[in-house]
Amino acid sequence: MPKLPAVGIDLGTTYSCVGVFQHGKVEIIANDQGNRTTPSYVAFTESERLIGDAAKNQVAMNPNNTIFDAKRLIGRRFDDATVQSDMKHWPFEAFAENGKPRIRGTFDVSVLTIEDGFEVKATAGDTHLGREDFDNRLVNHLVQEFQRKHGKDLGQNKRALRRLRTACERAKRTLSSSTQASIEIDSLFEGVDFYTSVTRARFEELNGDLFRGT
């Protein structure tokens, strides 16, 4: 009997992807945009619902109606301390319904078999840890740096935070292959330009406990 291919699905907090193991190797399946990962985002406009890359690409212009990080809410109550902490970083609103959080990647792994249905064979990991955790550390660090340099608190401005988060995510990716990344954002908040840099060593220091926990 020929061996059936094994399919792996990573429903991540920030990005999702699908891979198939066959012919002795893993192949990542591209989405309809040709990308090997798909942002775990959904957005709502007056006329349509956007998913993945299309949703993430318009987040700066439509932050209140663009949902991400939703996986963090699974199995938690609205008054959970982690939910309340996460909500401070979201431009969209969450509310309580029967004690559960509702809205308009965690680091976890499950092994399943597919034979007359799905059967979970094993699961492990930190279901609350995702890429956004690392981004949040850098965002918070730069919010403090901006206030220290310019005497302005951008922490309550959703659009400014979204632009800063996008720049932090880009810098994080750069640091995976370089020792330093530049962050340049024109007119970030109240007309003030923000130019700074972050080293890989500093990023690792900000996220040291998260790295050790994995």
Curated annotation (Swiss-Prot):
InterPro entries: ATPase_NBD, Heat_shock_70_CS, Hsp_70_fam. One of its GO terms (molecular function) is ATP-dependent protein folding chaperone. It comes from the Eukaryota. Keywords: ATP-binding, Nucleotide-binding, Stress response. Belongs to the heat shock protein 70 family. This is Heat shock 70 kDa protein cognate 1. It comes from Drosophila simulans. The lineage of its organism: Eukaryota, Metazoa, Ecdysozoa, Arthropoda, Hexapoda.
